Amino acid sequence: MSIDLESIQEMWEKDAQIDRDNLHEESLNIPSLHAKYFELYNTIFLLRKKAEQQRKNIRHERYEYFSGKADPEIYIENPFPKKIRDKDTMQKYLVADEKHSNSNLKIDYYDTMLVYIESILKVIQNRTFQIKNAIEFMRFNAGLG
């Protein structure tokens, strides 16, 4: 299974449903739901850390390339006629560089996934109260409350 935001959203759409006829089972299912999404959170967190390191490596590689300090073989395959020395100009080239931009987008995507899963985990932590309130409401409607 590939981990992407869409698949997590689809998974949560199913898992977020509470079966009103089996509230006791829903209550017992809370720890496994928490474990499932916490495992996802940890996996994505580690993937983000790896992507951060890749971004640093790409930034260094592209800095070397734009400053003319990269391995000469690289310029044979992909010539770059300039040697950037100015800090501001270098920053502009790095920001506009496709490889560097893609690594930033990847990290932003992981951040979006992490925020989404954090919100899921908060809902799961509150699920006990939701189930308790549902039971109390059912008792009230039945004239027992």
Predicted regions and their residues:
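Charge-rich amphipathic alpha-helical interaction elements
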Residues: 1-145
